[in-house]
C-alpha cells in the first residue's frame, strides 16, 4: 500500500488507492483535489496516478502497483527525488520518494507500506479454495496474502493463538488476528454510496481508520495462563527467547511444525525418531545425554535447571498411545527431567523467559488426589501441573488415591503442631463407639488403601527418597489433617497418615540393584548358583555379662517421658563402644580370611581341571558386551578441496592469505611434526673496564703459556744483542729444538750444562725462537764436540738464553714480580752473553792457527750481479783429532739482490754437510771478503767479516 505523508496535512497519513488519480494545486478546482497554499505552487501543479493491481498481484509478495507523477507545466517546476520534471512524467521506483512542489519548503513523501497476511489454513479449508474470496477483497487494495509465513509477513490470520505461525509472529514482533480483521480493512476502504469523488476513510486518515490488530485477537483456547490482550503486542525481547536451549523431538510431524518457531527464537531443534515397540528407552536417553555433552545414563548433571536440553513429549491417540505414554514416562524418570508439551511454548514466549520449560521432574510431581483436596488456586496455572502428573505417574497404582482423600466434614478443634513424629500413642481414647463399627471401619480403610501395616518408626531412606518430593505440595494440607485427627477413632487414626508412602514393586528390586551395583549383583547370582548364601551372615556379637549390664544401667538411670514410659539414655558407654569397634575389626579379619581361602580353593580347583572340563560357554556368558558408535570417515577424506570447505562452512574466504601462526594441521595429516629447535645461549660475565697493565701481564693463560711481551721490549732486546755481536765480531747463536733431547745436545756442544736446562725448565713452553747460522771454515771434524768449536746458539725473540759464569742477580727459582727485577735480569744476561762471546772468539782463533786454516774469497765482478767464491789453502797434516781435513772447496754461484745476498748452492765442508742436514742445522763460518779492482788487483778486507744466514741477509 502506498502512503502519502507531509506536514501540509497536519501530520496525517493518506492512503493512495490503486486506480485513482490525485490532483495537487493552489486552489480547489474539482472534487478530491488536495490544496497546497503556497505562492510558488500553481493552481494545477501536479498529478499522482496509481495504476491498478495486475491480476495475481496479491499473491506476488515482491510486486507493487506503479505510481506515475506528472508535472502540469507548472511555473516553478517539480523536483522528484532531486530531479526536475517540469512538464514531464516519471515513475517512482524507490520505497520512499520525496516530491517538492515549486519553492514550497514542505515536501511530499510517498512511502511503500507493505501489508502481508499469512493465513493458517487446514487441509480441509485449502480444498475449499479460499483464495478466490481473498483475491476479490484484498488484491485491489494492494494487500498481499500467502499460505506460508514469510519474512515480510505483518499479520498472521488464524483461529487459534497457539499455532506454529502464531509463535513465529510473536517472536518476530508481528500480530495474530482473525478473519474479522480483514473485514475491518475492507470496511475502512469502502467509498460512501451516492458521493462521487469522495474518499474512503483510509484515504482521509490512514492512522486513525486502520483497524487495531489487538482488537481482533483469536479467542483463548487451551493454552496455559491468562494473559491480557496487551501481552500479545510486539516485543523485541522475544527475538532471542530460546537462545541457549536445545529442543529434542521424537516425532517428525511435530518437529516440522515447531522447528520454524524455535529457529526464529535463536534456539536449536533436533529430531530423534522413535519406532513404537522397537526403540529402547536407554538408547533414547543416551542420545539426549550426548546432546547435552554428557555420557552414560541417569539424570542431567545440572539438575535440569537453566539453559540446556529440553525434551518435547508426544502423546498421540490410537493404538500406540499406551506405548508412547510408557516410553516418555520411563525416560523422564531416568533423566529426572520433565518433558514439556507443545502448548507451553506460548507461555514462555509471552513471558520472554524460556527457563520455565526446563525443570526437574520432582518440581511438578504432585499427586492428583492430594491436589484436589487443597484449596483451588488459579485454574490456568494448576492445569498443566495436573496433566503432567497424570501422564508421568501412569505406572503408579490407582489404589493410592483414596488413601490421600480426607473427608471435609470431619473437622474439630486444631491439635498443637508437632514438628516430629511421635512413636507413642495419643492420649485421646476416642468416642464410645461400638466395637462392630470400629472393626468394620478398619478393614475398609486397609482394603481401600491396600497399604500394609507400617511400623511405628518408618525407614529414613523411604522418607528421603519418595516423600520429600511431595512435601512442598502437602504443606498446606498438614494443618487440616491435624485438625481432624481428634475426631477419628484410635484405629482410624492408626490407618491414616499425613504422607502416603509409594511402595516399590517387588520385581523392580533386582533391576534397580543391577543398575546401581552391577558387580555386586553378579557376585550375588554366582553365589546363588553355587548353592551358597547370597549374603554372608554377620557374626553374632558376644553376649554381655550381667554385672556389666547392671553397671551400665546404674550409670544411666531410667527417666520418664511425657507419657510415663521409661526410657533409657541415648548413649551406651565407652566399654560397649570399644567392644563394637573390636567386633568390626574381627568381622573384617574374618571376611579377609574367607576371601583368601576362597581364592586359594579356586586356584587349586582350576589347577586340577583339564582343558575339557572348562565350560567356555559359561565364561562367555559372563562377558559384558556394549555397543558404541564408531565415527564414520568423511566421504572426501583428507583430499577435500577449498571449494568444498567453503560450501560446507568449514572455511571462510576471509581467512585466505593469513599466516598459520599457531601451526594448525589438517585432520588426518600424516606429516611428521618437526621438533622445535632449542637454542642454548651461553652467558659470559661482562668484564669491567680495567686501568693499567691488568692481570694478563702477570698470570698465565688457560694452556699454561706466558703471554707475549710488548713489541717495544722485543725490539730493545734485539738491538742489544746485535750491538754485542757487532762489537765482538762473532754471533753467539744457539739452536735448540722443542724436545728435551735437543736441549741436551745443545748443552754438550756449547759446554754450558745446566744453564740452558735450568732456563728451559723455568718456562713451561718456550716462546718463538730464531736460529742464527754461522759458517766456519776450519778443518776441524765435527764428529766429536769441542769446547772451543763454534756451536749453534738459539736466540729467543722474547728473552735470550745467556750462559754466564757469574751468578744471576735474581734466583731462577723465584719468578720476577716487577719490571725493575726483569730489567736487572736482562742486563745480567747481556753482560754474561758478551763475556762468553769474547772468550769463544779468542779460543776459535787460536784453534785455527794451530790446526791450519783456509781462506774463502768472494769475487764480485764489476757490472755483474753474480758473486763467485773459492777456497784456497790446505791443512798441514792431520788435525789434533787424527782426521785428515778435505783439501778442496766446491765452488758455487750466488746472486746478489737489492737488499741482501743469499747462497744458493755449495757447501762449506763436504763431509759434514749431510750430517748437519740430518741434524737440522747448517754450517757457518767467517769469510774474508776480497774485492777485485778495475786494474785486476784484489783488495782484501780482513777486518770486515760478512755474516751470512741461509735464506736472508742480516
From Swiss-Prot:
GO biological process, any: double-strand break repair via homologous recombination
Transmembrane segments: none
Polar residues: compositionally biased ranges: 368-377, 458-471
Single GO MF descriptor: damaged DNA binding
Principal location class: nucleus
Residue segments, region Disordered: 368-431, 444-506, 528-580, 630-654, 692-954
UniProt-listed InterPro entries: BRCT_dom_sf, FHA_dom, Nibrin-rel, Nibrin_BRCT2, Nibrin_BRCT2_sf, SMAD_FHA_dom_sf
GO cellular component, one term: Mre11 complex
Keywords: Chromosome, DNA damage, DNA repair, Nucleus
Function noted in UniProt: Component of the MRN complex, which plays a central role in double-strand break (DSB) repair, DNA recombination, maintenance of telomere integrity and meiosis. The MRN complex is involved in the repair of DNA double-strand breaks (DSBs) via homologous recombination (HR), an error-free mechanism which primarily occurs during S and G2 phases. The complex (1) mediates the end resection of damaged DNA, which generates proper single-stranded DNA, a key initial steps in HR, and is (2) required for the recruitment of other repair factors and efficient activation of ATM and ATR upon DNA damage.
Record text on subunit structure and interactions: Component of the MRN complex composed of two heterodimers RAD50 and MRE11 associated with a single NBS1.
Record's comment describing the protein's domains: The FHA and BRCT domains specifically recognize and bind phosphorylated proteins.
Name under which the protein is recorded: DNA repair and telomere maintenance protein NBS1
Species in which this protein is naturally found: Chaetomium thermophilum (strain DSM 1495 / CBS 144.50 / IMI 039719) (Thermochaetoides thermophila)
Amino acid at each position: 500500500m502506498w502512503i502519502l505523508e507531509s506536514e501540509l496535512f497536519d501530520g496525517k497519513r493518506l492512503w493512495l488507492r490503486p486506480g485513482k488519480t490525485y490532483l495537487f494545486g493552489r486552489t480547489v478546482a474539482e472534487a478530491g483535489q488536495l490544496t497546497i497554499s503556497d505562492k510558488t505552487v500553481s493552481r494545477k501543479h501536479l498529478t499522482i496516478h496509481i495504476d491498478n493491481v495486475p491480476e495475481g498481484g496479491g499473491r506476488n509478495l515482491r510486486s507493487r502497483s506503479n505510481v506515475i507523477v506528472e508535472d502540469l507545466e507548472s511555473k516553478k517546476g517539480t523536483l522528484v527525488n532531486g530531479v526536475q520534471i517540469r512538464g514531464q512524467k516519471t515513475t517512482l521506483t524507490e520505497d520512499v520518494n520525496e516530491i517538492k512542489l515549486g519553492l514550497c519548503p514542505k515536501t511530499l513523501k510517498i512511502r511503500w507500506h507493505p501489508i502481508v497476511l499469512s493465513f493458517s489454513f487446514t487441509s480441509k479449508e485449502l480444498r475449499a479454495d479460499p483464495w478466490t474470496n481473498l483475491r476479490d477483497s484484498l488484491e485491489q487494495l494492494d494487500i498481499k496474502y500467502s499460505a506460508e509465513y514469510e519474512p515480510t509477513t505483518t499479520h498472521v490470520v488464524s483461529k487459534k493463538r497457539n499455532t506454529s505461525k502464531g509463535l513465529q509472529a510473536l517472536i518476530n514482533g508481528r500480530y495474530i488476528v482473525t478473519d474479522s480483521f480483514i473485514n475491518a480493512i475492507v470496511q475502512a476502504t469502502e467509498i460512501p454510496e451516492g458521493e462521487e469523488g469522495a474518499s474512503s476513510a483510509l484515504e482521509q486518515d490512514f492512522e486513525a481508520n486502520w483497524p487495531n490488530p489487538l482488537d481482533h485477537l483469536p479467542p483463548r483456547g487451551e493454552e496455559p495462563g491468562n494473559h491480557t490482550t496487551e501481552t500479545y503486542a510486539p516485543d523485541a525481547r522475544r527475538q532471542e527467547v530460546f537462545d541457549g536451549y536445545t529442543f529434542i523431538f521424537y516425532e517428525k510431524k511435530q518437529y516440522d511444525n515447531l522447528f520454524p518457531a524455535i529457529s526464529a527464537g535463536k534456539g536449536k531443534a533436533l529430531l530423534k525418531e522413535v519406532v513404537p515397540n522397537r526403540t529402547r528407552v536407554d538408547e533414547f536417553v543416551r542420545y539426549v545425554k550426548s546432546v547435552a555433552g554428557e555420557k552414560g545414563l541417569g539424570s542431567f548433571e545440572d539438575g535440569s535447571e537453566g539453559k540446556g536440553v529440553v525434551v518435547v513429549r508426544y502423546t498421540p491417540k490410537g493404538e500406540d498411545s499406551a506405548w508412547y505414554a510408557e516410553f516418555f514416562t520411563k525416560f523422564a524418570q531416568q533423566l529426572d527431567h520433565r518433558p514439556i508439551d507443545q502448548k507451553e511454548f506460548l507461555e514462555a514466549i509471552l513471558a520472554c523467559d524460556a527457563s520455565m520449560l526446563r525443570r526437574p521432574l520432582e518440581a511438578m510431581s504432585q499427586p492428583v488426589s492430594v491436589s484436589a483436596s487443597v484449596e483451588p488456586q488459579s485454574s490456568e496455572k494448576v492445569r498443566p501441573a495436573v496433566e503432567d502428573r497424570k501422564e508421568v505417574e501412569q505406572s503408579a497404582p490407582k489404589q493410592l488415591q483414596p488413601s490421600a482423600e480426607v473427608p471435609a466434614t470431619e473437622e474439630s478443634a486444631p491439635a498443637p503442631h508437632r514438628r516430629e513424629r511421635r512413636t507413642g500413642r495419643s492420649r485421646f481414647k476416642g468416642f464410645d463407639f461400638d466395637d462392630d463399627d470400629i472393626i468394620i471401619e478398619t478393614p475398609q480403610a486397609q482394603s481401600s488403601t491396600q497399604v500394609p501395616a507400617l511400623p511405628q518408626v518408618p525407614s529414613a531412606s523411604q522418607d528421603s527418597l519418595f516423600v520429600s518430593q511431595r512435601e512442598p505440595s502437602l504443606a498446606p494440607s498438614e494443618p487440616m489433617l491435624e485438625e481432624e485427627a481428634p475426631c477419628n477413632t484410635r484405629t482410624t487414626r492408626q490407618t491414616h497418615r499425613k504422607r502416603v508412602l509409594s511402595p516399590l514393586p517387588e520385581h523392580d528390586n533386582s533391576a534397580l540393584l543391577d543398575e546401581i551395583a552391577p558387580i555386586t549383583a553378579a557376585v550375588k547370582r554366582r553365589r546363588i548358583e553355587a548353592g551358597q548364601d547370597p549374603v554372608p551372615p554377620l557374626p553374632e556379637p558376644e553376649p554381655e555379662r550381667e554385672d556389666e549390664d547392671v553397671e551400665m544401667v546404674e550409670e544411666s538411670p531410667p527417666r520418664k517421658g511425657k507419657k510415663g514410659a521409661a526410657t533409657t539414655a541415648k548413649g551406651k558407654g565407652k566399654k560397649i563402644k570399644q567392644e563394637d569397634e573390636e567386633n568390626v575389626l574381627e568381622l573384617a579379619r574374618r571376611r579377609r580370611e574367607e576371601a583368601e581361602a576362597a581364592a586359594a580353593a579356586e586356584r587349586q580347583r582350576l589347577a586340577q581341571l583339564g582343558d575339557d572340563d572348562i565350560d567356555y560357554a559359561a565364561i562367555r556368558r559372563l562377558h559384558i558386551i556394549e555397543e558404541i558408535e564408531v565415527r564414520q570417515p568423511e566421504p572426501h577424506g583428507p583430499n577435500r578441496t577449498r571449494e568444498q570447505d567453503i560450501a560446507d562452512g568449514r572455511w571462510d574466504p576471509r581467512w585466505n592469505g593469513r599466516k598459520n601462526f599457531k601451526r594448525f594441521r589438517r585432520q588426518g595429516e600424516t606429516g611428521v611434526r618437526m621438533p622445535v629447535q632449542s637454542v642454548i645461549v651461553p652467558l659470559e660475565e661482562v668484564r669491567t673496564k680495567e686501568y693499567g697493565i691488568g692481570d694478563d701481564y702477570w698470570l698465565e693463560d688457560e694452556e699454561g703459556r706466558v703471554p707475549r711481551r710488548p713489541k717495544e721490549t722485543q725490539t730493545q732486546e734485539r738491538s742489544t744483542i746485535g750491538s754485542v755481536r757487532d762489537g765482538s765480531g762473532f754471533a753467539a747463536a744457539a739452536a735448540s729444538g722443542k724436545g728435551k733431547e735437543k736441549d741436551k745436545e745443545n748443552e754438550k756442544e756449547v759446554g754450558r750444562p745446566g744453564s740452558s736446562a735450568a732456563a728451559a725448565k723455568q718456562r713451561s713452553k718456550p716462546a718463538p725462537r730464531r736460529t742464527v747460522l754461522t759458517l766456519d771454515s776450519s778443518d776441524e771434524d765435527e764428529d766429536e764436540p769441542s769446547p772451543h768449536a763454534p756451536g749453534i746458539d738459539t736466540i729467543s725473540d722474547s728473552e735470550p738464553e745467556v750462559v754466564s759464569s757469574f751468578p744471576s742477580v735474581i734466583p731462577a727459582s723465584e719468578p720476577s714480580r716487577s719490571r725493575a727485577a726483569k730489567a736487572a735480569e736482562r742486563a745480567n744476561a747481556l753482560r754474561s752473553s758478551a763475556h762468553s762471546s769474547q772468550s769463544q772468539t779468542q779460543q776459535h782463533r787460536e784453534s785455527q792457527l794451530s790446526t791450519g786454516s783456509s781462506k774463502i774469497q768472494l769475487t764480485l765482478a764489476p757490472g755483474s750481479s753474480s758473486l763467485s767464491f773459492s777456497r784456497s789453502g790446505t791443512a798441514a797434516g792431520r788435525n789434533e783429532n787424527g782426521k785428515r781435513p778435505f783439501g778442496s772447496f766446491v765452488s758455487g754461484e750466488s746472486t746478489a739482490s737489492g737488499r741482501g745476498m743469499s747462497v744458493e748452492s755449495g757447501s762449506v765442508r763436504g763431509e759434514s754437510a749431510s750430517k748437519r742436514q740430518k741434524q737440522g742445522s747448517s754450517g757457518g763460518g767467517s769469510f774474508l771478503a776480497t774485492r777485485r779492482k778495475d786494474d785486476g788487483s784484489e783488495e782484501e778486507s780482513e777486518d770486515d767479516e760478512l755474516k751470512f744466514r741461509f735464506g736472508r741477509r742480516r
